[in-house]
């Protein structure tokens, strides 16, 4: 297995798909990394030479990926919550922050339904 940016890239996949195992690298960025490194993106990872892998490591190193990206996203969300702006409040309450309806739906953000308390007489 090839190791790039601290992630084991699956050997059986094409380079373009294999690079998407790195957090912060999707299909488009993966293809652009391969083109910039001069590596054929349809080639399997196991068929890459050490020189090709080194070029890919160098190109991936130019982007914010994995732990640094996760930390950056977390800090951005924390900043919004500290500001107390609308998006920060919605993050804090665990509700959708992009204007979706919440009377029905929004189950992914809100979590499983809780049983309603029965009123005492």
Curated annotation (Swiss-Prot):
Residues 92-121 are annotated as: Disordered. The keyword RNA-binding applies. GO terms for molecular function: rRNA binding; structural constituent of ribosome; tRNA binding. Disulfide bonds: none annotated. GO terms for cellular component: cytosol; small ribosomal subunit. GO terms for biological process: translation. PROSITE patterns: RIBOSOMAL_S13_1 (PS00646), RIBOSOMAL_S13_2 (PS50159). The keyword Iron-sulfur does not apply. It comes from the Bacteria. Keywords: Ribonucleoprotein, Ribosomal protein, RNA-binding, rRNA-binding, tRNA-binding. Belongs to the universal ribosomal protein uS13 family. Located at the top of the head of the 30S subunit, it contacts several helices of the 16S rRNA. In the 70S ribosome it contacts the 23S rRNA (bridge B1a) and protein L5 of the 50S subunit (bridge B1b), connecting the 2 subunits; these bridges are implicated in subunit movement. Contacts the tRNAs in the A and P-sites. Part of the 30S ribosomal subunit. Forms a loose heterodimer with protein S19. Forms two bridges to the 50S subunit in the 70S ribosome. NCBIfam families: uS13_bact. This is Small ribosomal subunit protein uS13. It comes from Burkholderia cenocepacia (strain HI2424).
């Amino acid at each position: 297995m090839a190791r790039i940016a601290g992630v084991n890239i699956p050997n059986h996949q094409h380079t373009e798909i294999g690079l998407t195992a790195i957090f912060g690298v999707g299909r488009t960025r993966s293809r652009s990394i391969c083109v910039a490194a001069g590596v054929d993106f349809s080639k399997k990872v196991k068929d890459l030479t050490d020189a090709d892998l080194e070029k890919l490591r160098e190109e991936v190193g130019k982007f914010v990926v994995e732990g640094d990206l996760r930390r950056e996203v977390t800090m951005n969300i924390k900043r919004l919550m500290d500001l107390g702006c609308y998006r920060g409040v919605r993050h804090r309450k665990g509700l959708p922050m992009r204007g979706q309806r919440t009377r029905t739906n929004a189950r992914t953000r809100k979590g499983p339904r809780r049983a309603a308390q029965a009123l005492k007489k």
